[in-house]
Structure formats: C-alpha cells, structure tokens
C-alpha cells in the first residue's frame, strides 16, 4: 500500500511519466532495489525527495524499530491487563518450564508436533481442560483461582543456598528460582502462597528453627538467673558448717567456690557467642527476604529487563542512523566542495554538490542504488574518497549492521552506569531483537562477508583482464573498482563501470553473487532464531532457502519469457539479459543492463522485488518478531487466550 501511494504521488508530480513506470520505480525504491525503467536524473527535486522517503521507509535498519516498539507495547499491554507476567530484571524466557502444582510434571511437545496430531479446535479445548484438576484425585479446587508454577530466571542473585537442582551453574548472571502460586481470575493477581514451593518451605523451616532457638535461649537465661541464688545458699550453708571444721577443709571449700565461678564465666561467654551468631543469622535472613521481595515486582513493567533492553535499542538505533547520515553527508559534501574536478562533474550534470551528497548518502546506506547521474557512478570511478566512503555506507546499512551493533553494545556496556540492559542484549540477542546475533553467528557473518569480497575481487581480476570497461585505468584505479564492485554487486546496485562492456563470464559471476547476496545474513538470521525449527542448523536453512529461491525466480522468468516472446524471437533481448535483470530484482540489488520490458513484465518484476525483500525478513515463528507467540501449553499463553475469548 505504501508503494502504491508513493507511485500515485510520483505520477501526480511527474505526470508525463506512464503510471506503470511510476509504480515500478516506487516499489523499486521501497524495496531498496534501485531498478529504474526511465531516467530519473531529470526529475524534479520534489520527486527525488519523495524517492528518498520511500527508500528510508524500506531501510533494513529502520524496519527494526517497529519490531522494538511492538515488543514494548506488548509488554505494557500485558502488565496493564493483568499482573501475571512480571518480574523485575526478568529474562526473556520468564517462565520456561511449566509445573502444575497438583499434577505430575511432564514435558510438552512443540506446536508443530501438536498440529500434526490434533486440529486447532481440539488444541484449544485441551488448553482449557489443562487448567482443571482430575476429579478422580479428590482434591479441592477453587474455581476462582488458577494454580500455576514455573522457573523464574532472574538476573540478580536471590539466595545462594538454593536446593540442589535449582541452580544454574552455566549461567553466571542468571539464577533460577522455582515458583508456585495462584492467579485470581477476577482480580488478575498472582500470589506466591502455595505451600508446595521449595523456597516457601525453606523459609518456614528457617522460621521454625529460629523459634526453637529463641525458646532454648530463654530457658538458658532462666537457668542462669536461678543458678546464682542456688550457689549463694549452698555457699552459706557450707561456710556455717566449715566454721566448725579444720583449716584444711576451709581451703578445700574455697577451691570449690573458685571452680564454680570459673564455670559460670565460661557459660556466660558461650551464651554471648550463641547470641551473636543468632543475630547474624537473623540479619542474613532479613536481607534474603528483602532480595526475594525486590525482584518479584509483578505490577511494574518499567523494571522488566526486557523492557529496559528494548528501550536502550530505541536510543541506540536512531543514534546509529543519524550519526552515519551526518558523517556521510558532511564528508562527501565537503570533499565535493573542496575538489575542483568533482565540482566540474556536478556542474556538467546540473546537480548541486550538497544535494548529490545528501541523496547518495541515503541511497548508499539504505542499499537502494539510485543515482542522480544517468550512468550511475561511472563518472566518478576514479574518485577514491567518494567510492570508499560510499562503500562504507553500503555495508554499514546492510550486511554488517548486526556486527557493528554488537560492537556498540559491548563498548557501551563497559562505560555506562547501567550495564545490565546491554548485557542482557548481548547474552540474549535473538530473543529480543531480530538483527542482533550471538557472538558465534556474528563472527561467522563477518568472516563470510570478507570471504565473498576477496573471492569476487580475485575472480574479477582473473576473468576481466582485457575488458574494455577498465581501459585507460591504472592498477590502483582498477583495484579500487574491483573492490567497489564486490561491495555493491551483492547488495546496493551502484556500478562504477559500464556493465555492457564487461564480458559474459563476469556478468555470469555477478548473477551468482546477486543470487546469494543475502545468504550470509539469512543464515545467521534463521540459525539464531529463538524457538525456530532451523535453530543451529545451517544445512537445513540452506535447503529450505535454496528450494524457495530457485522456484520463485524460475516461475517469474518463465512468465517474462512468455510475455516477451516477440522480443526474444527478434533478438532484441536475450534470455541471459532477462535472467540478469530478474536475479537483480530478486536479490534487491539493482544492477541493470537496460532492457526493454512490457507492462506485464514490469508487474512480474515488482512481484520479484517484493519476494526478494520478504526473504530478508524474519519468519513469523521468530519469537523476537511475534512476542505473543508462546507455546500453547504455556500458562501465560493460555490465560491471554481465555481472556480474549471472554471479550468476544
């Protein structure tokens, strides 16, 4: 719909251009493909600015912001509807294991297995029945309450003396605590009042032990108070009797009194030590209770760790985009203003240098490949600074965005006063954000990207030695254009050399690179997806992607060949030219060798652009895209489902 509206606006401004061409260019800009059927260098500034807006709306980086906003909205809505899904500093898998308080624990199957055995209606009925107890168990159940349990995974330590089996030694920043409680259907409140919770039982045992110790202490104090009086009476009687005895007996009596006094002092010291130990134990117990009550804040989403982490992304991503735009615009514009040869090129094409800098900064960062010159960037193929700067903008806005985002988070976490949200993003990347990968997948993405670039440069140097496109160039300029072509061929679509002068072997190399243009990113995206069937399975990802990516272009090329059968028979165009343009559209690259197309073929190309853009997006089963998509057997998911049914 956005592409259609943009096309209508382009038609209203450039009314001489056919609507099908406006529609083609509008969707080409929105999908950041960059293919054009007419020369846009002569369009008005208003139309070009509209193209910049469409390009920005289709930006790979900008499209991640609505996902972040969606997840934050979901968290707020859940907290506002009920206070059952909450815990300050909770990790994304807040309740990962469901333990029913009256039923034996059992493992739940995945959604795919359930869908194979039961239809959707039966699954819904089973979801409702799972809340009810078995009548044969003869156990009392309150219809107003829903008893649930689970493992609460917190980011701060609560009790280091947890029972064995509940501690997670592999996660240094997370601590697992089993919880069991009830949810009131009417008030939607959750309470940890179930006696089956191990933590509650441990606290009750500690309280009983403290009460017993206090009773023993009171008994000891009473005995100590009675002991001096007894000792005095005994001493008086003994002294009266010993007055009639000899001096030796008197000395023995004095020795007895001394030993009793020493024993008394020892008992007092022992009691003091016991009281100090009890005081320390009480203080530790109170501190543990404070820590236990602090993270279990079930009524505030502002303390939720995932919510805080998403908030940091809402600041970092716009700052990332704006910073790159400013640096790219100023650097390119300043270079053009300071270079006489660059100014002469702009003047010859009737383009302002600063406007050229702004337009190409947006086009390069968003990998659109749209240019203000009719021959793309061929006129500046000897400008080292411009080509290198544009190439940096290209990979910062597409393939290497996850790499630099992870580096930024790592650096910020080292110097910020609040590092917990950043650490949460680094430790749980794909469960929170689509374009943030774990460390292993991030390194693999960067290594594969480097291998692709080096391989393309080497193959171009091997296959394109005597091509006319590189005549009158020195070795440094040739190597520069090899490098720029390796960066631009797979994503952006800028061309610094005339493609029609390249050999068919090099063009065939370009076809292969455009076809696999987004594979490094797609593989990292699918392998790192949370609760995905292709998680950590590169081979399965490649099979699924290749089957789909071969079938879709083949069908579209077949239809285009049917629509352009007359041009093929007359030799105006060739099958290879159709293949090159189709793969360029499907890969959202934008390289073109300028072929003539009919109206129906242009519509097929629009469908190819949209299909190519869709394959770079996460699947619908990705947890970081669909936060409400929890397992059907999860308690939270059931409660939300039943709540929606009541509203209906």
From Swiss-Prot:
Q: Which UniProt key words apply to this protein? A: Coiled coil, Glycoprotein, Ion transport, Membrane, Potassium, Potassium transport, Transmembrane, Transmembrane helix, Transport
Record's subcellular location? Membrane
Q: Which GO terms describe its biological process?
A: intracellular potassium ion homeostasis; potassium ion import across plasma membrane
Q: Which residues cross the membrane?
A: 48-68, 313-333, 353-373, 385-405, 443-463, 472-491, 505-525, 550-570, 571-591, 592-612
Q: Which GO terms describe its molecular function?
A: high-affinity potassium ion transmembrane transporter activity
Q: Which Pfam families match?
A: TrkH
Q: What is its main location?
A: membrane
Q: Which PANTHER family match?
A: HIGH-AFFINITY POTASSIUM TRANSPORT PROTEIN-RELATED (PTHR31064:SF30), POTASSIUM TRANSPORT PROTEIN DDB_G0292412-RELATED (PTHR31064)
Q: What is this protein called?
A: Putative potassium transport protein DDB_G0292412
Give the species this sequence originates from. Dictyostelium discoideum
